[in-house]
Amino acid sequence: MKSRLFFKIFATYLIMMVLVIAVMEFFLTPAIRDTVTKGVMERMTGHGRIMALMTMDELPAKVGELAAGAEARVTIINAAGKVRADSSEKDQKMDNHLNRSEVQEARLKGVGTAIRYSRTLQQNMLYVAVAVREKDRLQGYVRLARSLEE
């Protein structure tokens, strides 16, 4: 009789714990994901702002080095949207990037961000673009990208 009572109490507590964990998972996972994404976006923006201090002539030669330091894919885009260098792909086969939402936002505000699917890498990516200016003239953009799958 004591073992049946123990089993009923144990089963009740077990069910309650599973329900509490499920509810916490449902509500906390999106909040944690948003917090982590925001932190990654802020770090990428910081890296992009530092890179944007370089000239458009310097950036393409250092794209691999910059990508390694930022732990992100780096794309150098001229003011017309043509890709001048990319740390992951050959720039000759890449589309014009001027109409990408993060680039358009960077054109208007100096920094632009977007979360969207990359056809090139076939996964959801976080993008940060920073306008590169020389003597107050827009020269192009530094765009950083990281997978949201990581």
Task: Briefly describe each language-model feature range.
Residues 1-83, 88-96, 107-111, 133, ...:
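Juxtamembrane segments flanking the first transmembrane helix
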Residues 57, 93-142:
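Membrane-proximal, non-catalytic sensory/regulatory domains of signal-transducing membrane proteins
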